[in-house]
Amino acid sequence: DDVSDFESVMQWLADKQPAKEVAIRLIHNDFRFDNVVLDPQDPMKVIGVLDWEMATLGDPMMDLGSSLAYWVQADDDPFMQGSRRQPTNAPGMLTRQEVIDYYGQKTGWSVANFDFYEVYGLFRLMGIVQQIYKRFKEGNARNPVFATFGPFAHYLGQRCEQIMARSSL
């Protein structure tokens, strides 16, 4: 009740959804930094991917958008820094834009209009955060950090709105 429904974000996603010619592939559907095993000799090389229980067929860039929703970089504001659960803001780590560019380079796919996928990833995370916050408010999740998930959901919605406002889509 104290977390917005973000209807404007849902409508924007519906209106801006990429054309149907998207390449459908097997996607992990929970692809994020803490679900990969990196080569200790070459940290740009993934040698394992964990937790495949949510895998499905879909647009592979949705995996990237979802992954980057969790990606906190060094120049993010204090609120986002406080949400960090992965070492993505450590010195030498790629920024979100550098990850997007690297992905485009490695796949050969255009990442020019990535705003849709970035908003999608943030919106997806917002839904997860709202669900956990609701369980916390009802007494079904007790971790005190979950008390911050209501404000965090609002923050994610504001980030969506900022991306939507500057987007050329």
Question: Where are the regions a protein language model picked out?
Answer:
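Short beta-strand segments
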Residues: 26-32, 48-50, 118, 124-127
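An alpha-helical support segment within catalytic cores of ATP-dependent transferases
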Residues: 1-29, 39-45, 104-108
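All-alpha amphipathic helical-bundle segments outside canonical DNA-binding/catalytic cores
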Residues: 110-121
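Regulatory N- and C-terminal appendages and interdomain linkers associated
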Residues: 127-169
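Catalytic activation segment of kinase domains across protein kinase-like and atypical kinase folds
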Residues: 37-79
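Active-site activation/catalytic loop segments of kinase-like enzymes and analogous catalytic loops
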Residues: 62-107, 121-138
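Generic structural signal for small/hydrophobic residues in well-ordered secondary structure
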Residues: 13, 31-34, 64, 126
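Short, structured helix-loop boundary elements
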Residues: 3-10, 61, 146, 150
